[in-house]
């Protein structure tokens, strides 16, 4: 099976993401590495739709911060009213100045549209004064072909976390047109046991969701939580 491999493992790092259904030992994870590649960042599900709150988020976020992780929260978007979803997310994420904020834009039974995704991210931007990143894969690659130029410009100004279970990220839409980004901020290369190794880390069971940041842990820390909104 293929695996990620780098000549200088100090110049890349991993970011793990999970929700309450994923068993995780944060103390073990804080000490883990894979072939000398460290995992300094974690992104945890916080909310979904207009009212759901992940029951593990608050406890894990507090523990992770105490262990020195870079911490981020994500909201799983649905077709419900955007303003209500943004309020649900910000109320329960309770972001500090160092909490990363992300929208999970992917297929589900109550599908969020691209316009709603942009509106959600903008609402988070305006409420926090910094940018909300977007996580997606084929959902965005399909939706983006109908985007307006202003929507593409908006997305290009926000960090992209790509789900693409492969060694190298493919940065084109379903029509093979370049996405608004040249490279992703994060590349989720494995999940649910699919994609290149590693599929687990100490403290995270096999089938973990892991993403690659092409930069050192220090560079990831400097870029975290994400840039402020341009004035």
What is each PLM-predicted segment?
Residues 1-36, 151-231:
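Functionally critical loop-and-helix segments that line ligand-binding/catalytic clefts
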Residues 2-76:
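N-terminal carbohydrate-binding/catalytic regions of secreted carbohydrate-active enzymes
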Residues 13-17, 40-45, 70-75, 99-105, ...:
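Structural recognition of the beta-strand scaffold that forms the well-ordered cores
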Residues 19-33, 52-63, 80-94, 118, ...:
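Alpha-helical scaffolding within the catalytic cores
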Residues 29, 64, 103, 124, ...:
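Conserved, mostly hydrophobic/aromatic
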Residues 44-50, 67, 79-83, 105-107, ...:
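Cell-envelope and extracellular/periplasmic
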Residues 62-70, 91-95, 122-130:
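Sec-exported extracytoplasmic/periplasmic mature domains
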Residues 100-176:
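Catalytic domains of cell-wall/extracellular-matrix polysaccharide-remodeling enzymes
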């Amino acid at each position: 099976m293929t695996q990620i491999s780098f000549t200088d493992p100090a110049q890349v790092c991993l970011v793990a993401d999970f929700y309450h259904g994923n068993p995780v030992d944060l103390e073990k994870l804080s000490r883990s590495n894979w072939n000398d590649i460290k995992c300094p960042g974690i992104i945890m599900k916080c909310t979904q739709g207009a009212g759901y709150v992940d029951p593990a988020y608050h406890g894990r976020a507090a523990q992770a911060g105490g262990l020195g992780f870079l911490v981020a929260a994500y909201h799983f978007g649905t077709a419900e009213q955007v303003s209500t979803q943004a309020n649900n997310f910000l109320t329960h994420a309770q972001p500090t100045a160092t909490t990363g904020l992300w929208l999970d834009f992917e297929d589900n039974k109550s599908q969020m549209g691209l316009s709603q995704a942009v509106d959600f991210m903008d609402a988070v931007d305006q409420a926090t004064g910094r940018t909300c990143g977007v996580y997606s894969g084929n959902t965005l690659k399909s939706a983006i072909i109908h985007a307006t130029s202003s929507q593409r410009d908006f997305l290009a100004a926000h960090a992209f976390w790509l789900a693409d279970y492969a060694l190298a990220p493919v940065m084109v839409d379903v029509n093979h047109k370049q996405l608004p980004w040249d490279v992703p901020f994060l590349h989720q290369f494995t999940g649910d046991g699919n994609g290149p190794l590693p599929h687990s880390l100490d403290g995270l069971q096999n089938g973990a969701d892991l993403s690659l940041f092409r930069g050192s842990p220090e560079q990831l820390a400097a870029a975290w939580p994400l840039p402020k909104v341009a004035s």
